[in-house]
Design a protein with these regions (language model features):
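Aromatic-rich, lipid-facing transmembrane alpha helices and their immediate juxtamembrane interface loops
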Residues: 1-179
């Protein structure tokens, strides 16, 4: 990562637009391809997929951006433990999202993915409070609102991906008769 890279408000909003456009394609495809019956079978595959995806995201992010971003907002021990914490927390969150989605009298895919987006915005509100847009030089001057907005659409994309992976895992399990 170039030391002089600057994440600006404009870049965050452009990123939000890109994620929103991808979400606008991803969600209808999931609604088309994942029936309510199938979604009910995705309880544990979504937990496993979420744990693995979020472990991977955080292992990559901490590995790539520890010095330039995360060392400014996390304690030193987080460099080792955040990916593992994400593994456990994401699995638990996936279970909660799945339970919420099957209980709400609304589209289960939209509930699962949009609530994932809300969680993203909440985590970025926390990051803003910790100084994510004021402490790291590469983010100084970026709008806190833009950081929260991009998180909403970015996390919808991640939770759509988790749901797609869960469906693939479930399909493979049925085809290969695993467990």
């Amino acid at each position: 990562m170039p030391v002089d890279l600057k994440i600006t408000t404009e870049l965050l909003y452009k990123g939000a637009l890109v994620f929103a456009l991808m979400d606008a394609i991803y969600i209808p495809v999931l609604i088309w391809r994942v029936s309510q019956e199938t979604f009910r079978r995705l309880k544990w595959p979504s937990v496993i997929a979420a744990a693995l995806v979020w472990y991977g995201i955080w292992a990559w992010a901490i590995g790539k951006f520890w010095e330039t971003v995360y060392s400014y907002v996390f304690p030193a021990w987080a460099q080792t433990w955040v990916p593992w914490i994400a593994f456990v927390v994401a699995g638990s969150v996936a279970l909660g999202l799945w339970m919420l989605a099957i209980r709400i009298k609304w589209n289960f895919i939209l509930t699962f993915c949009l609530m994932g987006g809300v969680i993203g915005s909440l985590t970025h509100l926390w990051a803003v409070q910790r100084g994510i847009v004021t402490k790291p030089p590469m983010l100084q001057g970026a709008s806190p609102l833009a950081a929260v907005v991009i998180a909403f659409f970015e996390y919808i994309f991640y939770w759509c991906t988790i749901l797609a992976l869960a469906k693939i895992m479930s399909w493979l399990q049925m085809k290969l008769k695993i467990i």
